[in-house]
Amino acid sequence: MSAPSAVRPTRIRLRPWQSEALERFANCRRPDFLAVATPGAGKTTFALTAATQDLADNPGRRLVVVAPTEHLKHQWSRAALRFGLHLDPQWSSRDGALPSDMHGIVTTFQQVATSSQALAGLSRDAFVIFDEIHHAADDRAWGTAVLRAFEGAAKRLSLSGTPFRSDTSAIPFVEYHLDEARADFEYGYGEALADRGVVRPVYFPRINGFMEWVAPDGEVLAATFDDELGRERANQRLRTALSLDGQWLPVVLDQAHGRLVELRRHHPSAAGLVIAMDQAHAQDIAGVLRERHGVQAVVATSDDPDASAKIAAFTASDDPWIVAVRMVSEGVDLPRLRIAVFATMTTTELFFRQAVGRVVRWTPGLHGPGARTQPAWFFLPDDPRLRRYSAELAESRRHSLRKRQGSEEDPLAADPDDVADALGDDPFGDDEQMSLFSVIGAVAIDADATTAEVGAAAAHGLGVFDDDPDDPGVGREPDGVEVVLLPPPLPGGGHVDLAHAVVGDPASDPVSSMTQRERKTRLRDLNADIAAELVRSTGWGYVQVQNELNRLTGIRRVSEATLVQLEARLDHGRSWLRRAG
């Protein structure tokens, strides 16, 4: 059994916006607070700092984090560990009471819909964090369940990477003005760029094309992205460009890979992301990268049970490419991404900003050409909808740079973006007989010129989201405010055992980087092995053995046991096995 040890403080240097947001949060008398901050700015650090301070002021209070996806649950749990917070990312309403050595849990909006009653009890007087709160509107039942599950919470901190609207039903715990969510604190992309060292400037090579296709009604059509089309035909044009039956996408992948090769000369771990339409499309794109460039791309899709493991392995590697489908909007945390290719039919502004957010995260410690600004490139079809979204972000980028450079003229000011009328923000609706749709061909137009133009822009140092749990940012904010946080007391009394809480170097000490849940999983597996051996040695039934081990340890069930109790249960099992032998 591990001996208790002193509590070690966590030192964090907050960015100026985080410090300001924390002060505003502390002065907010209402239970609800909405913070909107651009992806990569450090929303997770802000939220966990706020939670740590609140739990320290309110001993016994639990913390509940609601994340968009299963993958993000584990990222939040690991990020919380840096603050001395133990959160269970595998909580289930069937587990019984939460063990007293856990500060709380991480769940998903989807899980809330099926476990709202259990969560209502767990979250009473709790501190609740909603990561990307707009996901509560993904399903009408989710919003209702969120309200039912968390209306008894003491504090509710909602996070979002971009301002959002509610055109159908209001999201619980969010105030609105003219259908627009009213943020209590907002930190935009332009502000983050102006602050330097927070996010990267992103450049948007927009590739035109000439597409030919047979529409579902049998009509043969041809158009470039400059031609004005209605929504239905525009979607068909985009689908044609993205199809690998044509040459538009392979040429764009060539351009993106060439840019990545250049980047990796000075940033060897830099990587690229392709956002695909579906699983088959993702596999085909990986095939193109393999055949044309000799690289083995990682494919991660939401329906792949091994997707999280693949992403974790890719994050720790220096592999050049990953191809994803919906997981890009679900918080894929890959800080080394510098290149992206938008090859999906999802054309809503929210999804676009989420996708751009995958390449904006600043990487400290880079050296060599481009290290001062760390530009990223996001390759796009020159679809008018995407053109408009990218132009708005580009204007934020240029505005922040003009502020930074005073009266100096922007070298690209004479080359304005062509902003066409949007074709609508609705997601692509497959309400056609798409089985009758077929691609004749697609070719890229002026791809070389577009990429060269954007490369020249970056050479001048100029430039343009669901967030991920991020690094607490120790020692990288020269203008920030340093805070010292002690791990808050556990709900069951006492403080975090340092022997179980310290996060060390995973390479030299893998155990020290494990979360409390991961340690417990190992101990549960060892307990299960001992129980199986006892069944063979004693002739007792499996349930009898388990119940006796629980009795000896003084627990009702394994899922309610603390880490110390699981260690004690294992010791009882080993002693019993020695006697039985």
Give the label of every model feature segment.
Residues 29-50, 275:
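Walker A/P-loop
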Residues 9, 168-269:
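Interdomain helical connector at the RecA1-RecA2 junction of SF1/SF2 helicase-like NTPases
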Residues 2-36:
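Conserved pre-motif I regulatory segment
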Residues 296-408:
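Conserved RecA-like P-loop NTPase helicase motor core
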Residues 70-93, 288, 292:
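Conserved helix-turn-beta segment of the N-terminal RecA-like "Helicase ATP-binding" lobe
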Residues 119-158, 162-164:
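SF2 helicase catalytic motif II
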